[in-house]
Amino acid sequence: MKFTNTSVLFAASTFAFPANVQRDNTLQISEFRASTSIIDSASMHFVVTDANYPDDTPTDCNLLWTYGSSPEARARCNNSQYYIRFPDGPVDFNLFTLELERVSGPIAEKGQAKLSSKSAPWKCVKNPKEGIELQCEYDGVLRMKV
């Protein structure tokens, strides 16, 4: 009988304390591009893929605002699950920090990436076509640590 009681207690403790869940420590950002027009409007687009939340991603993230100012403080990706922020203030596409933070869920995530047009893979071109003052694009997939 002692063996049976011990076995039941061991089995119950195994179910009470599940193994640690493996988590991914990066967000993948693809299709990352931004541009400004000659009338000072700015736009940014990227796609977030998060291995920790496969049911919510990939999701598009799109921003429109007046260049030289900051986008809306509580801007979110299209699925509403990621805040988009620029912690260094108003965005200059030649040098800026992008911050993403998961709005809710069991795995908290917040990460930043600094981008500079002076070094690949973030590339910016001045006056690429009529009406566009600056056009920038990330070559490849950006992996943001969270």
Regions found by a protein language model. Give the residues of each.
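Fungal secretory targeting signals
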Residues: 1-23
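Short, surface-exposed binding/anchoring microloops in extracellular/periplasmic proteins
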Residues: 19-70
